[in-house]
Amino acid sequence: MKIIWFFRSVLFSIGQITTLILFSVLGQFTRPFSFATRYQFMHYWARFCVVWVRWTCGVKYRVHGAENINNNTAGLILARHESAWETFAFQAIFPRQAYVLKRELLKVPFFGWGMALLNPIAIDRAAGRKALNQLVSEGVERLEQGDWVVVFPEGTRMPAGELGKINIGGAMLASKAKAPVYLVAHNAGEFWPKNSFIKRPGCIDVYISKPLDTAEMSASEINQQVESWLSQHLSSAQASADAKEEIHHKS
């Protein structure tokens, strides 16, 4: 079975890398145009990856709480980070977004070139308080421009089922912006694990909260709520994955 998964993952990677090179090079010709135009162009690559991994590796997904999304008001997404999958899939689930990411990622050939077209909030983690201030100021600016902002408060990809430390940056932005906040949990790491070449077939469960009203909440209070919600729904996502694994073995 793992041999089949390996060759299916090879096929996925060939398609992903080939189209990444194509989109990142052609995307440079969209630089003179608006951010909306650049985003729309690169957005097709992200959506392709979601479809391609389903066709080649059998990685599907279903969303719980899609009805909670208000497409008319830009929101802040504080999401679980387990895999590369969510960076693609969120572009199929939510409206136009700006990502908060490590500045070093923009130096990665092809991938970084494409990301630079999307006006990300690229921070230097070593800058400490300066990086937090940048996250808040640029995040507020993007939200005011009508773009959603995606923050992974754990700061890095975590193993499936393991909750990392919830950093304060996303909560500080939520407190300052007073924008609706959506919490997102999923179990993508069960099927597309961190640092693993092989993708396992299965269905990723994505949980989206109702928008939180943070107008009267401090950053600390928001952070506590984020940690509590993610912990609870991480357990739900893990239980769902375990149930599917048991059914798979029985069959």
Give residue spans per PLM region.
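Non-catalytic C-terminal accessory region of glycerolipid acyltransferases
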Residues: 3, 133-251
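Thr-Gly-centered strand-to-loop micro-motif
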Residues: 64, 101-102, 123-125, 153, ...
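Glycine-rich helix-loop-beta junction characteristic of Rossmann-like nucleotide cofactor-binding loops
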Residues: 65-70
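Membrane-interacting alpha-helical segments
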Residues: 4-11, 15, 19-22, 26, ...
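Catalytic core of membrane glycerolipid acyltransferases/transacylases, capturing the structured
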Residues: 20-47, 55-57, 71-128
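Short gly/ser/thr-rich secondary-structure transition/capping motifs
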Residues: 56-64, 132-133, 187-190
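Generic preference for hydrophobic
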Residues: 63, 77, 99-100, 206-208
